[in-house]
């Protein structure tokens, strides 16, 4: 039904704001980044406890802007920490909502609110509910899962939604299919994901929320275990985990995660700010080199995306350090809202069948590792 106009509402919760957008087919009718009072958010002990507050903010925004979602065709929420899943668009059901709320994927992240908010709005306005490429998309190759401790496996935690969409759009830009290219794709923002994509599968990458890879404006990044243990003597486990996702990186060095503020310090001649900034980009480049090895050096392009690319020197430094690996192509900003709406539209038009959440992780250990193997 190509002539039918489908209305699609998209919800993308972030740490201090919620991005909302309404699409009519491919046309974006509006998009808004609704910021939340930080003092209000600090009152909530858990991410899930924010749900009523964020629902109220969304409803107030819709009312204030005279936006009526009655008859909406689809509501799409950013996917969170259910059990690990294959890449794709999922029709949201009660099981997926419950497992996300319970954080079965062991990631306490604000993205867990996406499908919960969408499901709540569905009760009021109807329509179908979807989620696309959640943070727990798991396509890791076997070698990427193994650690130096038996029974402890690396997990796939990345900005899968933006990484996958940017990779697909870049392949189209090259006149090729994503499934026939080898790419290193980097999401560079408050969190940083550096990932290896082999023929359409994201086979390796740093677990940014778990403390792997480069430090970021909010995350401490990878550190020697001995240093972490020494630091733990002065911190509780909860406080240390908080450094992994919120209180590390720029927040630790400067007392702010605001990259614009740190950049202003550099422009004013702050040598320490420049040192830390350059070290972050240096670590991104190191991670890109690691992903090149994952792909045997057979890399078609290095693709950059994310909000921090508004600072041109980040792209320039990556070109200088990593350009010998493959061409570097940048897509500043993010494509998450467009990805969610566009893929839902394909489902509504009958061009794509949604996946259904099974309630089981897509990978559940090595058979050869089990005691009776």
Predicted regions: what is each one?
Residues 299-318:
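Glycine-rich phosphate-binding loops at beta-strand->alpha-helix junctions
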Residues 60-73, 173-177, 288-300:
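Phosphate/pyrophosphate-binding loops at sites that engage ATP/ADP/AMP, CoA/4′-phosphopantetheine
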Residues 332-373:
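Structural signal for terminal/edge beta-strands and the immediately following C-terminal loop/tail
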Residues 312, 316-342:
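Conserved phosphate-binding/catalytic loops in two-lobed NTP-binding clefts
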Residues 8-49:
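Short glycine-rich, Thr/Ser-proximal phosphate-binding strand/loop in the N-terminal lobe
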Residues 112-119, 131, 146, 151-182, ...:
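Glycine-rich phosphate-binding loop plus the immediately following alpha-helix
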Residues 242-297:
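Adenine-nucleotide phosphate-binding core of ATP-dependent small-molecule kinases
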Residues 62-110, 128, 136-148:
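Short beta-strand-loop/turn "lid" adjacent to the catalytic site in phosphate-handling enzymes
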